Curated annotation (Swiss-Prot):
Protein family membership: Belongs to the CDC73 family.
The protein's name: Parafibromin
This protein's record includes keyword Transcription: yes
Subcellular location: Nucleus
PTM characteristics: Phosphorylated. Dephosphorylated by PTPN11.
Residue ranges, compositional bias (Pro residues): 338-352
Gene behind the chain: Cdc73
Sequence motif Nuclear localization signal, location on chain: 125-139
Keywords for the protein's UniProt record, in alphabetical order: Acetylation, Cell cycle, Isopeptide bond, Nucleus, Phosphoprotein, Transcription, Tumor suppressor, Ubl conjugation, Wnt signaling pathway
Amino acid sequence: MADVLSVLRQYNIQKKEIVVKGDEVIFGEFSWPKNVKTNYVVWGTGKEGQPREYYTLDSILFLLNNVHLSHPVYVRRAATENIPVVRRPDRKDLLGYLNGEASTSASIDRSAPLEIGLQRSTQVKRAADEVLAEAKKPRIEDEECVRLDKERLAARLEGHKEGIVQTEQIRSLSEAMLVEKIAAIKAKIMAKKRSTIKTDLDDDITALKQRSFVDAEVDVTRDIVSRERVWRTRTTILQSTGKNFSKNIFAILQSVKAREEGRAPEQRPAPNAAPVDPTLRTKQPIPAAYNRYDQERFKGKEETEGFKIDTMGTYHGMTLKSVTEGASARKTQTPAAQPVPRPVSQARPPPNQKKGSRTPIIIIPAATTSLITMLNAKDLLQDLKFVPSDEKKKQGCQRENETLIQRRKDQMQPGGTAISVTVPYRVVDQPLKLMPQDWDRVVAVFVQGPAWQFKGWPWLLPDGSPVDIFAKIKAFHLKYDEVRLDPNVQKWDVTVLELSYHKRHLDRPVFLRFWETLDRYMVKHKSHLRF
């Protein structure tokens, strides 16, 4: 008898059906348990005195059913199904043997003990099929019974037709029943009608009560809703209720402008009113506050006449010269001009002198062949994981002209505690649309390789060399570790970031190194920006 691996190979080559029923795998007349061991040795076992391990039937069968998946996806799905995984070094050799590309394999242990399959009984199956076929055959006795039933039914219907009441046999109710019996029937009908009407009235009264209760509840609810105030937060304000977002923004700007120019418009002087002299205005009496020296007030000037003491005088706000010159100098002293309060809108700078932005700008290549594009920039720089642009396109992501990423970092406080803060960075791929004042905020650029990427940039040399650009902006180059470095990048001052094709767990250290390098550069050259 052949081993289970050979039978599986034969069925796979001939494209025969393999039935999995419960914990058994059925190959025609033979069946094996799922956990039966084959004679294919697991890679890495049986060396240096270690015992040999063999792949089970369900692990190889699961590989055949999921051969179209990539190995990482296959491993995750097998772990979910709690099935042993076929290791990557054995995958190609095992599939070649099962598909008939190779007649044998070096990993097949011919001396391994063979598991004998169970032979299924075909006679039992054949007997069951015969019973099912016999059950499907119509019996002659059953057909005879059906025919007799139809004849009886037809005869009964014919008899019913013959016994139909004729119009000559109809008599009046007074001839068939007594008057007393007819009166009793009428009394029962009237009593039933009265009870029915009474029930309907009760239902109407109940419905009326419920309706009045609902109306009262509606009035109370309307009163409560009229006193409600919508809780407005930063998030709810930014969520527009209509298609035109400008309506919400303009309403907010109008309210802010009205608050800055003055809450009460009636306080502004009318344009046609005559100006009033401020000296003619009646001074409002200032209420006297409590003074602990009120009990020592002098009764009159006659008691201090000989001392020449001015009990109402003060040296507050006077210079030394005015004090030494005496009271005459104090009389000629003019009061200091009081500062005139200005409205809030005048205290702030005008719109054309608004404060510039402190958000740093990162420029990335616009070419679709670049590893970092506008589709995956947020995944790379914010989430610190590499997602190819093609995969983002398959997910239906739309390309934006620019994006704003939120970088999370730990910031040390004076007490020695660290708090997590979020710093915004603006990412663009069209630098020619930047304003002249925006170039001072450009802190990093991702270089692709060709020099034409910097065409039209400031600080570009006449020969087209971007050497001076890299002296003012920190440059980075993102590539795979197996790809050869571009010759232009080798001779430029560019920090190279290498990614692995398959090891996605190494992406985070690479992008953390990018942020550390950029932070050191900004501390030295761009300390006025927010980072």
